[in-house]
Regions:
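...captures the hydrophobic TM-helix bundle architecture rather than a specific catalytic motif
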Residues: 1-288
Length: 288
């Protein structure tokens, strides 16, 4: 990045992305949360496709389409929540949803769904797109052309936004067993398929990308089981070790390019070696 003409742009977007993430987790109503959710999607698209060449532009367009599709269902869920509960503040929505008995008929058929189930399913689809849950996972494995610090932020923070959203709205999701069953099924399916795909990759970044999808699947499973506190613990643990692994992988790739004819001298990178070893143990669930 030292010789990159877009170095200043990269650092500015990086700082704005972190700021948007911090503001998003501090929101107490849907309006502000959706605004920073959108900013996060925008910065994510710009950062993860930092270099303008053919494959990057193609994957950037795919990312834009998938994230926008999820955002449409998210805003639809917000609109229905406002129609049902008359407010967008989380605390008031939780209180009013617990006593609401609204029933919707789907397409005029005999199939009926409660208002809280409809709202939570639509919001969950938005979380699926952000956290790369199957079948909305296609954008993540193809967006691996950016500098490694971007991937450390992306996989350790931004992709966790979907899991955070479900945990933040835990009182609302807990009111719908139907939605929790759907979340559990999608999370289980994602965890199994993503970890299986991870095992057959021969590119280290794609391997870590699919591992992130699998970890997000585990987090969704925990939310589907009602273990929202465990999901938050998983979010923090995953963010710490995935950021460390990505940064150390980036250092390894960089040094392999500088010294292609000989292995990197390990004595100069003791800290990276030890931190990678600890992160690998955590990743393997050897340490709680």
């Amino acid at each position: 990045l030292q010789q990159d003409a877009g170095h200043d742009r990269y650092l500015t977007l990086f700082a704005l992305c972190i700021s948007s993430l911090l503001f998003m987790v501090s929101c107490a109503d849907f309006i502000m949360l959706f605004i920073f959710w959108q900013l996060l999607s925008w910065f994510l698209s710009l950062l993860s496709h930092n270099y303008l060449h053919g494959p990057t532009i193609k994957s950037g367009f795919r990312t834009f389409i998938i994230l926008r599709a999820g955002d449409l269902t998210f805003i639809a869920g917000i609109a229905i929540a406002y129609h049902l509960y008359g407010t967008l503040e989380f605390n008031l929505i939780f209180a009013r949803a617990s006593i609401d008995q609204t029933i919707f008929s789907i397409f005029g058929s005999g199939l009926q769904i409660t208002g809280v189930t409809l709202v939570t399913i639509l919001i969950f689809v938005g979380a699926m797109s952000k956290s790369a849950q199957i079948p909305l996972h296609m954008w993540l494995p193809d967006s691996l052309f950016a500098p490694t610090p971007i991937h450390a932020l992306l996989h350790a923070g931004l992709i966790n936004a979907g899991g955070f959203l479900l945990a933040r709205l835990a009182p609302l999701f807990s009111l719908s067993s139907t939605t929790l069953h759907i979340v559990l099924f999608i999370g289980l399916l994602t965890a199994i398929l993503a970890t299986s795909m991870m095992l057959v990759q021969n590119d280290i970044k794609k391997t870590l990308g699919y591992s992130t999808i699998g970890q997000m699947g585990y987090m969704m499973m925990e939310c589907g089981l009602g273990a929202f506190h465990l999901a938050i613990f998983h979010l923090i643990a995953h963010g710490l070790f995935k950021a460390d692994i990505f940064l150390n992988i980036g250092k390894g790739i960089h040094n392999a390019r500088l010294y292609p004819s000989k292995p990197v001298e390990t004595n100069h990178f003791k800290f990276s070696n030890y931190s990678s070893l600890i992160s690998s143990f955590v990743f393997s669930f050897l340490f709680p």
